[in-house]
């Protein structure tokens, strides 16, 4: 695709199934407290592949490390250890020019669209800015054509009604559409979407997710979808990775993870979600998580979930932490007692 274009041909089914555009291996990020007394393990050995044209959901409670993982992929912060390979390029080996190109190919949709926009800019300036930074379009007329095309993709038409407005003049849903358009305008390979619908009203969330899913299919994009809401991950993602205290504890297709969860933490997340059934709202089952999430500077021995798990035994504390185990079809989990529960 040439630089001014904003559409990408959808990949073949074989490419979507087999080709990894993002490979994360043993990724780690430690933060040191201001006094240097504590080392916070925000991301603690995360590994996964993202296939071409795939949506991977990273799901977990606040503090599980999912947003930090997204920032590491975006190179907004540097990893303490591990590797991130995008389309065959190891990000640790990128020079200045390669890093600049990388930031065009890997884009982020932020949780708060208003905070990510200059309030003094008009919408046309918000969308033109990335084109100027990356030298796309030799004239403003060319760039405005790309701006209008991006706005058409996110259903903000006619564009003339919005171009001269400022961000505060738009609704939350409209701002998120503009944030999505700004990401798409650079024709990225991968989009990291960090809680993209959590700050807009419930009635608009499904609409925005439908829009993003349609655009993803049309352009053949790969998404890392970060969310605390496993119900939106079920709708939006092809695969789901459940994170707890810096590690992935279960990963697989969304059907397997949601319909046949193995790890007790995954089960608790799912069972806490209310879904409409037979005209009323019911809780699926009753399985509560006890206590608070431990500090990432003092991770429990053995299984890190054991302090909140209803099924934990002494061996969960004394034996080494369980590694991810494949139980078939790429469905992996990290629970030693999964057959018993």
Language model features with spans:
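Short catalytic/signature loops enriched in Gly
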Residues: 4, 13-20, 34, 160-161, ...
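ABC transporter nucleotide-binding domains
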Residues: 1-260, 339-341
């Amino acid at each position: 695709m040439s630089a001014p274009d904003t559409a990408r041909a959808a990949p073949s089914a074989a490419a979507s199934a087999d080709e990894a555009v993002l490979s994360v291996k043993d990724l780690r990020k430690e933060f040191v407290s201001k006094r240097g007394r504590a080392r916070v393990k925000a991301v603690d050995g995360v590994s996964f592949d993202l296939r071409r044209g795939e949506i991977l959901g990273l799901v977990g409670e606040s503090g599980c490390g999912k947003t930090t993982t997204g920032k590491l992929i975006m190179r907004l912060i540097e990893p303490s250890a591990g590797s991130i390979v995008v389309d065959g390029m190891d990000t640790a080996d990128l020079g200045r020019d390669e890093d600049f190109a990388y930031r065009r190919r890997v884009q982020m949709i932020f949780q708060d669209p208003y905070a990510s926009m200059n309030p003094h800019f008009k919408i046309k300036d918000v969308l033109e800015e990335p084109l100027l930074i990356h030298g796309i379009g030799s004239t403003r007329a060319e760039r405005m054509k790309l701006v209008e095309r991006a706005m058409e993709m996110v259903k903000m038409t006619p564009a003339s009604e919005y171009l001269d407005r400022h961000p505060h003049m738009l609704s939350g849903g409209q701002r998120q559409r503009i944030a999505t358009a700004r990401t798409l305008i650079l024709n990225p390979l991968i989009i990291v979407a960090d809680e993209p619908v959590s700050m807009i009203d419930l009635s608009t969330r499904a609409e925005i997710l439908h829009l993003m899913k349609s655009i993803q299919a049309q352009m053949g994009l790969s998404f890392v979808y970060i969310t605390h809401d496993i119900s939106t991950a079920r709708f939006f993602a092809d695969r789901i990775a459940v994170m707890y205290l810096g590690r992935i504890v279960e990963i697989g297709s969304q059907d397997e993870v949601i319909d046949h969860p193995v790890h007790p933490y995954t089960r608790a997340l799912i069972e806490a979600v209310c879904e409409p059934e037979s005209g009323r709202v019911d809780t699926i089952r009753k399985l509560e998580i006890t206590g608070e999430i431990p500090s990432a500077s003092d991770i429990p021995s053995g299984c890190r979930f054991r302090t909140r798990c209803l099924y934990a035994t002494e061996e969960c504390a004394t034996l080494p932490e369980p590694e991810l185990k494949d139980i078939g079809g790429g469905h992996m989990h990290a629970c030693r007692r999964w057959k018993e529960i």
